[in-house]
């Protein structure tokens, strides 16, 4: 009886161990595929987010832009910067957020232009 119980326990541990190993391999493969999909631009964009303290989405929300167009970014930046000027009753905190958002979007535009040059395409403007 004890012999059979020991065999059942050993078989159960083997099954669970194999399942765990298979799940671990699948998770590793999925994380590698996701990293490959992000590519090199993802690393640059993440580095830009770390430097400015804002993600790309946050910067777009602050400046109210949906597409990365240098003209639209500049227009919205100038408007929000003037509106939040402390001399007209604005907030220095909000004005600094606007500046950081503009810096972040300018960095993203620079990264895109660099990628376009590397691909031999005309930069988007």
UniProtKB/Swiss-Prot annotation:
Keywords: Membrane, Mitochondrion, Mitochondrion inner membrane, Phosphoprotein, Protein transport, Translocation, Transport. Expressed in trabecular bone and cartilage and by differentiated chondrocytes localized in the hypertrophic zone and by osteoblasts at early developmental stages. It comes from the Eukaryota. Residues 58-110 are annotated as: J-like. Its main location: mitochondrion. GO terms for biological process: DNA biosynthetic process; negative regulation of apoptotic signaling pathway; ossification; protein import into mitochondrial matrix. It is a peripheral membrane protein. The modification Phosphoserine is found at residue 69. One of its GO terms (cellular component) is mitochondrion. InterPro entries: J_dom_sf, Tim16. It is found in: Mitochondrion inner membrane. Regulates ATP-dependent protein translocation into the mitochondrial matrix. Inhibits DNAJC19 stimulation of HSPA9/Mortalin ATPase activity. Belongs to the TIM16/PAM16 family. The J-like region, although related to the J domain does not have co-chaperone activity. Probable component of the PAM complex at least composed of a mitochondrial HSP70 protein, GRPEL1 or GRPEL2, TIMM44, TIMM16/PAM16 and TIMM14/DNAJC19. Interacts with DNAJC19. Directly interacts with DNAJC15; this interaction counteracts DNAJC15-dependent stimulation of HSPA9 ATPase activity. Associates with the TIM23 complex. This is Mitochondrial import inner membrane translocase subunit TIM16. It comes from Mus musculus (Mouse). The gene is Pam16.
């Amino acid at each position: 009886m004890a012999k059979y119980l020991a065999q059942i326990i050993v078989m159960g541990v083997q099954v669970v161990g194999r399942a765990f190993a298979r799940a671990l391999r699948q998770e590793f493969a999925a994380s590698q595929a996701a990293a490959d999909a992000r590519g090199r631009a993802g690393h640059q964009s993440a580095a830009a987010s770390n430097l400015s303290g804002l993600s790309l989405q946050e910067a777009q929300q602050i400046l109210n832009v949906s597409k990365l167009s240098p003209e639209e970014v500049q227009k919205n930046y100038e408007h929000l910067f003037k509106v939040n000027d402390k001399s007209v009753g604005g907030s220095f905190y909000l004005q600094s957020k606007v500046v950081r958002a503009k810096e972040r979007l300018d960095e993203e535009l620079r990264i895109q232009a660099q990628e376009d040059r590397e691909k031999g395409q005309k930069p988007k403007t």
